[in-house]
Amino acid sequence: DIEPIIKSVVDDFNNIYKLKRWIQISYVNDKKNKYFINGIENRIEQIVANLLDNAVSFSEDNKEVIVKVSKSKDNKVIINVQDEGEGFKEKDTNKIFKRFYSNRPDKFGQHSGLGLNIVKNLVDLHNATIKASNRINQKGASIEIIFPIP
């Protein structure tokens, strides 16, 4: 069950950013289901942590980041991280997963451009897929990982 792994990372980030920048990170499991995948626990933690770090980095103070877990119609497990930041400027969002690529504005500080590349490599390791898009009808970005059925 990946829920305890995700909740642990969300709690860690809330402990840091709730007081530091008043950013609320919410975990959503609408169906209250258990979600099982074949995966390496510390790598799943790293995926979620890197996605949250990226989402928080692009978020203004007093905003929300949402981590949602669900199942697709064909029972694949989906982890979706959404922020209320500026969204993606790139038409081809696959660019953001390239090594050393960064579109981070200076006001958000410098980063190596490796975080999302590491996520992509770990997602590939789990035979999963990842896609990035701008949120529909509101400001922000959405990154979705779809894990195969165990």
Name every feature range the model reports, one short phrase each:
Residues 1-14:
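A conserved beta-strand-to-alpha-helix junction within the catalytic ATP-binding
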Residues 34-39:
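Conserved micro-motifs of the catalytic ATP-binding
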Residues 83:
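Acidic ATP/Mg2+-coordinating residue in the GHKL
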Residues 88-100:
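Short conserved segment of the HATPase_c
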